[in-house]
Amino acid sequence: TDTEFEAAGGGVR
């Protein structure tokens, strides 16, 4: 899912 953590550039792709 999209979270602010992903927005910060730290998400599992």
UniProtKB/Swiss-Prot annotation:
The keyword Coiled coil applies. Keywords: Adaptive immunity, Blood coagulation, Coiled coil, Disulfide bond, Hemostasis, Immunity, Innate immunity, Secreted. It is found in: Secreted. One of its GO terms (biological process) is innate immune response. One of its GO terms (cellular component) is extracellular region. Conversion of fibrinogen to fibrin is triggered by thrombin, which cleaves fibrinopeptides A and B from alpha and beta chains, and thus exposes the N-terminal polymerization sites responsible for the formation of the soft clot. The soft clot is converted into the hard clot by factor XIIIA which catalyzes the epsilon-(gamma-glutamyl)lysine cross-linking between gamma chains (stronger) and between alpha chains (weaker) of different monomers. Forms F13A-mediated cross-links between a glutamine and the epsilon-amino group of a lysine residue, forming fibronectin-fibrinogen heteropolymers. Its main location: secreted. A long coiled coil structure formed by 3 polypeptide chains connects the central nodule to the C-terminal domains (distal nodules). The long C-terminal ends of the alpha chains fold back, contributing a fourth strand to the coiled coil structure. Cleaved by the protease thrombin to yield monomers which, together with fibrinogen beta (FGB) and fibrinogen gamma (FGG), polymerize to form an insoluble fibrin matrix. Fibrin has a major function in hemostasis as one of the primary components of blood clots. In addition, functions during the early stages of wound repair to stabilize the lesion and guide cell migration during re-epithelialization. Was originally thought to be essential for platelet aggregation, based on in vitro studies using anticoagulated blood. Heterohexamer; disulfide linked. Contains 2 sets of 3 non-identical chains (alpha, beta and gamma). The 2 heterotrimers are in head to head conformation with the N-termini in a small central domain. This is Fibrinogen alpha chain.
